[in-house]
Structures are given as C-alpha cells and as structure tokens.
Amino acid sequence: MSTDLKFSLVTTIIVLGLIVAVGLTAALH
C-alpha cells in the first residue's frame, strides 16, 4: 500500500469521525 493512499484513507476516516461527532452532539442538544 502506498503512503499517499494510506494518508488519504486516514484523513477520510478522521473527517468522517468529526462529522459523526458533530452530528451526535447536535442531536443530543
């Protein structure tokens, strides 16, 4: 696996995690 592919994959996971966290926070409040 190339470094660029691994980096973009990690970035995508982090972004998705942030979106989910913001969505849950908005839903709870």
From Swiss-Prot:
Its main location: membrane. It is found in: Cell inner membrane. It is a single-pass membrane protein. It comes from the Bacteria. One of its GO terms (cellular component) is cytochrome complex. Keywords: Cell inner membrane, Cell membrane, Formylation, Membrane, Stress response, Transmembrane, Transmembrane helix. This is Uncharacterized protein YnhF. The modification N-formylmethionine is found at residue 1. The gene is ynhF. Induction: Constitutively expressed, repressed on shift from glucose minimal to glycerol minimal medium, induced in low oxygen (at protein level). One of its GO terms (biological process) is cellular response to hypoxia. InterPro entries: YnhF-like. The chain crosses the membrane at residues 7-27.
